[in-house]
Amino acid sequence: MQLKIKEIFNQDYVKLEGQKIQIKAWVRSNRDSKKIGFLVLNDGSSLTNLQAVYRVDKIDNYEEIAAARMWAAVVIEGVIKLTPTAKQPLELEVLNAQILKQSDEDFLLSNNDLNLETLRLNAHLRPRTNLFHAIMKVRATLAFAVHEFMNQNEYSWLAAPLFTGNDAEGAGETFSIQKFDNEEFFGKQTHLSVTGQLQAEAYAQAFGNVYTFGPTFRAEKSHTNRHLAEFWMIEPEMAFVDLKGMQDIVEDLVKHVIKAVLEKNQQELEFLAQRNDENLIKKLQKVVESKFERIEYKDAVKILADAVKNGHQFENNEIFFGMDLGSEHERYMCETYHQGPVFLQNYPKDIKAFYMKLNDDQQTVASTDLLIPGVGELVGGSQREDSYEKLLKRCQELKMPIESLQWYLDLRRFGYYMSSGFGIGFERLVMYVTGVNNIKDTIPFPRSHGQIEF
Amino acid sequence: MQLKIKEIFNQDYVKLEGQKIQIKAWVRSNRDSKKIGFLVLNDGSSLTNLQAVYRVDKIDNYEEIAAARMWAAVVIEGVIKLTPTAKQPLELEVLNAQILKQSDEDFLLSNNDLNLETLRLNAHLRPRTNLFHAIMKVRATLAFAVHEFMNQNEYSWLAAPLFTGNDAEGAGETFSIQKFDNEEFFGKQTHLSVTGQLQAEAYAQAFGNVYTFGPTFRAEKSHTNRHLAEFWMIEPEMAFVDLKGMQDIVEDLVKHVIKAVLEKNQQELEFLAQRNDENLIKKLQKVVESKFERIEYKDAVKILADAVKNGHQFENNEIFFGMDLGSEHERYMCETYHQGPVFLQNYPKDIKAFYMKLNDDQQTVASTDLLIPGVGELVGGSQREDSYEKLLKRCQELKMPIESLQWYLDLRRFGYYMSSGFGIGFERLVMYVTGVNNIKDTIPFPRSHGQIEF
């Protein structure tokens, strides 16, 4: 019976006592005296290792197995033996062992205390460390949980285009495509998309509920621990849903994906808690159980001004209606004022994107950011401007190229009653759920200014 | 009770008789005499429309509702009435109706007989047609079914990087990124990736089973109905799996996703069968039930040569060992010789990529293509070269830049016993399952040479 390590530990393993099994795995460590040796094995299915005990009087090739180095690939046949008094509840008594492929002696990451920067420089090998095993397994759980939530709620996944001829999507610097054979491949200057929202709106007006889950690109030169040039976004868009209804969906989605990790990745979370943040699991459980607070932007400004009055020091203490809140202000709102997730809502129009619905006060737009302790902004969303005339006016005010947005404006001419949507930076979500501090450690092969290895 | 149309028809709707419900939807058509009118409504949840009957003696705003144009957004309250003798099993007797947003008169796609080219020029509106509703819903089912299969089988989803400094991934022309502020943003010339396979191998050596599902880019100027500049690929990679084991996984995956569509999208398939290919459903059922054939490349060459000898005319009748099979030859193999999916395997090394495992005959590599009736190649895969020396030699023979591939070569130094993987062009899969002839009609906003609208 060939088993994966996860299959062994995920069942009532008492029943496995005395069973003969086969396992293919990599050696994590190997120590031997002259008569008995211990292989610690991992096959990638689990953070848990399986210990295999080999004895000189049981196998013919004791010397060969004793020479298996870290990350050698091996195939082991053995009998499961319960070890109730040991740290591990069971081990494998080796009957037969073969080295499938020896490993070179200079494996770079054999030292467990390597710093994150060194691991980043070895992004092809870092998934073999416990830390990156844990992070990337949680990441995979989050990704599937997003698709699962969307599928359960009848959202169709949408592939938004990545090449765009439109430089006016309203979010930062874009990458451009070089000419090909001395001509523009697409017939005009082409950028890499920074959002799939505009196209998602077109599909929401036909399907009701859609979502994108794909890469986006931003040519930001910042070298902070919160920016990547290439990252993944989830952008749901719902027709017939207003700002408040959209916030409910954000809350349900965030809770669903965190619950999935709490259920599936207990072991990884325990490891990450130990390594990154001892309160990690409690923090996640609290999010799942809490009701997300909703606070008007204008009230947040008062709260922050009061905090300054009462002696709280921000780096930027100049608080006024119309300001773009800094990360420090956002974190104050969700970490100090309210200790948990907070939606701020109805921001001044001048600090938000052109497509957001103008409120009756003519000053603010129907927008919301979800602020999360330790991260700040995790989700940004809005109800979209549904009036052709108002949207056109706003585009003109901002001197945007109307022609390339005409199709987007035209959506408003054909029954565009209401649409709301939001964007989640997927790597921000991974940061939050894993407690990792640097966004470059949340994606397998990070791309940022000056960094393109692998 | 607010319901979606899909919820109405997906339940035992006899129970709904006499129930009062509310629905928000768009008008697909509206006709009235002076006393009675009929709204055909769709809310995007289903291909099925709901007919709502409004009467001048039941509602105050009969004239207003009678003026609702195609794609006007409306909210209707009414009572479900079963209509066993009509084509539709039920209708809505309107108690209250409001136009939420009128639609302009010049809706472009009001004619049902528009050709596909016109629809492509209106890619923002085409999801409102029955045809694109059906195609894109099937597409969404396929995408989720891929994630579902992978999750059930313990594969971790991997975000392969899209920016690459490596121009040697072995597949066609690439797009390059323009300099930014007069310098290379990433410090060296940067391309858009054509595959995530190399990075997937790194993760397979840590996790066992991984898969990518993301966009890839190819600067192909061809204007055929089978090429896009931007398309989506699924690339699973499995450690400890050989060519034959990999073919089993391909077969299971293809059957799983087709089964999902047969179960979830019966209505869409019936529509597509009527429109595209009357044998569509039978064809899909046959794939699910059949055992995929496996034929050696060298035997295929003999079969094709025999066909020519027996009078079959290919455009290219020159059949020899070492040739790259054309689409016509591939289709002969899966449509005429064997009427169903066929794996060809063990191709000559010179027509395949550098990373494929050299077979003992020194002539062929452990590669396979899955050929599907009506499409040709749907899947390409291989067992990877696991020997550092052989892989290095092959890179040198092909004059590839070793330096930027050193990390990939190095994987072989640390327990790289075995790895196999494959790639599925997602849009090819959608073509096959929907019976659509042009790949531009399988993706919401197609990008190809000269085409970048929306």
Swiss-Prot record, chains A, B:
Highest taxon of source: Bacteria
Subcellular location: Cytoplasm
A molecular function (GO) term: nucleic acid binding
EC number(s) recorded for this UniProt protein: 6.1.1.22
Paired cysteines (S-S): none
Primary location recorded for the protein, binned into one broad class: cytoplasm
CDD domains linked: AsxRS_core (cd00776), EcAsnRS_like_N (cd04318)
Keywords from the named record: Aminoacyl-tRNA synthetase, ATP-binding, Cytoplasm, Ligase, Nucleotide-binding, Protein biosynthesis
Catalytic activities: tRNA(Asn) + L-asparagine + ATP = L-asparaginyl-tRNA(Asn) + AMP + diphosphate + H(+)
A Pfam family of this chain: tRNA_anti-codon
Gene3D superfamilies attached to this UniProt entry: Bira Bifunctional Protein, Domain 2, Nucleic acid-binding proteins
GO CC, any one term: cytoplasm
Enzyme class: ligase
Record-level GO BP terms: asparaginyl-tRNA aminoacylation
PANTHER family: ASPARAGINE--TRNA LIGASE, MITOCHONDRIAL-RELATED, ASPARTYL/LYSYL-TRNA SYNTHETASE
Quaternary structure, from the entry: Homodimer.
Alphabetical list of NCBIfam families matching this protein: asnS, PRK03932.1
Protein family according to the UniProt entry: Belongs to the class-II aminoacyl-tRNA synthetase family.
Protein name as catalogued: Asparagine--tRNA ligase
Organism in which the protein naturally occurs: Ureaplasma parvum serovar 3 (strain ATCC 700970)
